[in-house]
Amino acid sequence: MALSCVFFHAHPDDEALLTAGTMARLAAEGHRVVLVVATVGEQGLTAGPVDAGRLGEVRRAEVLASARALGCARVEFLGYGDSGLDGRAVADGGLVPFAGVDPEVAAGALADLLREEDAALLTTYDPAGGYGHPDHVQVHRVGARAAELAGTPLVLQATVDRDLLLRALRLLRLVYPLPIDRGAFDNAYTPRLAITHRIDVRPHLAAKRRSMSAHATQTTGGESVRTLAALLRLPGFLFRRVLGTEWFVQPDLPVGRVIRDPLATLRRNQG
């Protein structure tokens, strides 16, 4: 039976890095995949021909292209402003910064969409927002409350295997001058033993690469190589190794046995 699966993200390109393979997999299986983005990421870094004042407009177009590459049936924007890395950014055009909005208000809007879609699955982030970005933390708060309001049966927190991330950063920094303090990620995302879902997305890496490539503005800017650009430059075998798995935590599930199917809980309950 085809199900409606809603993926909730903070900014354009978050979907490409965290859940693109799972989205492509579910779409290929015939499920309805919906992408919800809280902001258009207008505070992000960029360089080249894009004027900073138009960055949000361009990134909106980029995430729509990414969604097409993944087979999404619908893309919705909650319409909040990008709060910036420190949560203090002044949103453009009078928008309310997402990190500062009342979570109950934003959750109500998302819950309306979940009900409209009769969503079986909602993905959010872990309580720390992965690496602590204020908008990512807010995605967790808003997503958890929206699922509660709408009665969405399955909530998965998109995350990264912290142990693999630290090894990958060591490897990437041998090749690229990444602007990343490895120590900043010592407590980021989720330790391997706390992860409940490990999803093999290698059959869908072509779609994931197209999704990542759609976010051209996020491959430039800053003083050194951007993370997205570095990942896209990886040779095929390393791309498969680094990006061939996606990880989730199901908060109400005891850790232990690793689940390989994002919809396993729903299938078990239906069976």
At which residue positions do the language-model features occur?
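Metal-dependent de-N-acetylase/amidase catalytic core
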Residues: A2-V6, V90-A91, L95, G100-G271
